[in-house]
């Protein structure tokens, strides 16, 4: 997990902003899916050296498109989703990424490199 990151606080922050009406097929499972998405996001960051094993900044940059694909594939597999539900999940992950970024910025946990 990323140093300074509070998963429960992030989960609550994100769930307050994601509307069940926007994801009706997944609405009954939003808390579990967002929790799994956070875990998949952190796994992506560790595996791709965005954060190191101690939770500090790693040697690589976060690649949004790559992370998005990683999370969707991981969650679709973990939840045994058919292709139609996987597409619905992709929409949820897209929303998650927006609100996760907002959360990270609100906590001062992201640093934008101008290069």
Q: What residues fall within each predicted segment?
A:
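An amphipathic alpha-helix signature
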Residues: 7-16, 31, 35, 39, ...
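Short, flexible helical or helix-coil boundary motifs
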Residues: 18-25, 41, 45, 49, ...
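Amphipathic alpha-helical interaction modules
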Residues: 22-70
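Amphipathic alpha-helical binding modules
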Residues: 76-115
